[in-house]
């Protein structure tokens, strides 16, 4: 099965409830879809008024071994008292299967949205990221990939080349801007960082707040540099980002060492995320959920803006990286 062409159109509510019933769970409420385009995620309540979340994985995106590694990492983190949403085990298994779909069941954990401009919350997140990475350093993922240029830049570049949905009037300029950006990232990228298991997609939307942070959604967990789990939390102008990063690092280093040389990877990682995200949208265009929710992707104005974004990011890559105050 080609995951680029796959849709979830055969995942009917009856299929979901049958899968849950196989694990001894009877759904007593409706299935409320949660915000996830890559997978299909639903919240529900059972007959005992317990709340759960069930996640059906997009076939062929991750292998069974890769998903199991994600689950094992989550369970290790819970054991090490890191607040993460970890899957529940049924007959000793966290990864379950039904009618060709793999799925997992999680307890439904409520919470407020993490406030990215709240320094006290940022400090707590930094401390727990230090603990998360302390667990992540124990051993690398064996089956899940490393963050690198091939997956995040060169493969997406080919996707852009082959994409029919990029308007013909914008494609040449966009590809030129892409190539210039790729060259700039390649010049800045370094691989001498210490590799560890990461959350991988640690932005404010994947952190809930319940008297402390709760990390959710390890679906993008990979091996890579520690800074990958820090930079997406930064916002505002450079002065604000500097203060936020210093707050995170100071709290982080109460638990784990942090190599400040990795700060130079922030803008290359940002560029890689920009490129990878666009390629992801194109790859998923065959899933009806994507044209419905991203209708602007075929518009000339959108691709003109992306070209401008790539040009601006290239300029940033040629500037000095974010600098901490001298005490660091």
From Swiss-Prot:
Annotated binding of Mg(2+), by residue: 206, 217
Cofactor names: Mg(2+)
SUPFAM superfamilies documented for this protein: Protein kinase-like (PK-like)
Subcellular localization: Cytoplasm
InterPro entries found in the cross-reference section: Aminoglycoside_PTrfase (IPR002575), Kinase-like_dom_sf (IPR011009), SrkA/RdoA (IPR032882)
NCBIfam families: PRK11768.1 (NF008738)
Protein name listed in UniProt: Stress response kinase A
The gene coding this protein: srkA
